[in-house]
Amino acid sequence: MPRSLKKGPFVDGHLMKKVDMAVANSDRRVIKTWTRRSTILPEMVGLTFAVHNGKKFMPVFVTENMVGHKLGEFAPTRTYHGHAADKKSKAKK
């Protein structure tokens, strides 16, 4: 169920302060954040965030298509190593 329109999108206060400072100073440095739950707003377009995935910080450059999504959607937390290969079928070939 989506968030109520009267509440508006959720963005952590400390992240919004960093975004406002970066926009005001036209600063293009990477903004390091642990807040994966914050919604991407139109003011964030063009900024680069370093979003923590539980192990390291993943760089996320925000584009117009990302507005309305969460920051955590673009920093995967799980690595896929593929399914285990069947050793018997490889040995016959």
UniProtKB/Swiss-Prot annotation:
Entry GO terms, CC: cytoplasm; small ribosomal subunit
- GO terms of molecular function: rRNA binding; structural constituent of ribosome
Among its keywords, does the record have RNA-binding? yes
Keyword Electron transport listed: no
Q: Which UniProt keywords apply?
A: Ribonucleoprotein, Ribosomal protein, RNA-binding, rRNA-binding
A Pfam family matched by this chain, by name? Ribosomal_S19
GO:BP terms for this protein? ribosomal small subunit assembly; translation
- Which residues belong to the signal peptide in this entry? none
Family listed: Belongs to the universal ribosomal protein uS19 family.
Extract the HAMAP family matched here.
Ribosomal_uS19
Q: What is its biological role?
A: Protein S19 forms a complex with S13 that binds strongly to the 16S ribosomal RNA.
Name of protein: Small ribosomal subunit protein uS19
- In its UniProt entry, the species of origin is given as Nitratidesulfovibrio vulgaris (strain ATCC 29579 / DSM 644 / CCUG 34227 / NCIMB 8303 / VKM B-1760 / Hildenborough) (Desulfovibrio vulgaris)
Q: What is the lineage of its organism?
A: Bacteria, Pseudomonadati, Thermodesulfobacteriota, Desulfovibrionia, Desulfovibrionales
